[in-house]
């Protein structure tokens, strides 16, 4: 059994290398929040029933549309993939980089979201903090 995929959005400033994550009112994943009982699965942990994997392009398109952005405004980070154990099954989580020079503040604001530094995420649930840590490591590599 597989749960719907989620996407974390990050913006890395090209000139200053400042890293910001897009935080929605419900947390850091889009298009919908993780369930309260969600737990981050270990890296390399086997996911049952994942013989067929859905390509994340539709997820990127849906999130871009939700934010009023173009699909080209979000680039998938190929080096990142995580899974979160939920009551519905394992939910794949991808990392998308916002490609604009500056973060799309207006698009974020229209969605009720805001850009935060990783240090401003201390109040997130443990699963989301773990996802942020892995995403940050991926972006810094």
Where are these regions (language model features)?
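Solvent-exposed amphipathic alpha-helical surface segments
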Residues: 70, 99-101, 139
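A short coil-to-beta-strand element that immediately follows conserved catalytic motifs
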Residues: 68-80
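Short loop segments at secondary-structure junctions
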Residues: 13-15, 97-103, 118-120
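Conserved Nudix-box catalytic region and its N-terminal flanking loop in Nudix hydrolases
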Residues: 2, 13-66, 70
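A structural signal for well-ordered alpha-helical scaffolds and beta->alpha junctions
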Residues: 56, 60, 87, 125-129
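Nudix hydrolase/Nudix homology domain
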Residues: 2-4, 33-45, 103-141
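Active-site-adjacent beta-strand/loop module that shapes the phosphate/pyrophosphate-binding cleft
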Residues: 78-108
């Amino acid at each position: 059994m597989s749960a719907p995929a989620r996407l974390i959005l990050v913006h890395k400033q090209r000139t200053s290398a400042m890293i910001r994550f897009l935080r929605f009112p419900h947390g850091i994943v889009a298009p919908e929040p993780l369930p309260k009982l969600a737990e981050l699965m270990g890296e390399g942990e086997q996911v049952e029933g994942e013989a067929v994997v859905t390509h994340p392009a539709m997820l990127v398109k849906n999130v871009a549309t939700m934010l009023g952005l173009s699909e080209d405004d979000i680039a998938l980070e190929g080096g990142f993939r995580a899974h979160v154990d939920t009551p519905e099954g394992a939910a794949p989580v991808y990392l998308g980089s916002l490609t604009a020079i500056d973060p799309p503040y207006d698009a974020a604001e229209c969605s009720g979201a805001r850009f935060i530094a990783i240090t401003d995420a201390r109040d997130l649930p443990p699963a989301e903090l773990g996802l942020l840590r892995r995403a940050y490591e991926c972006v810094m590599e």
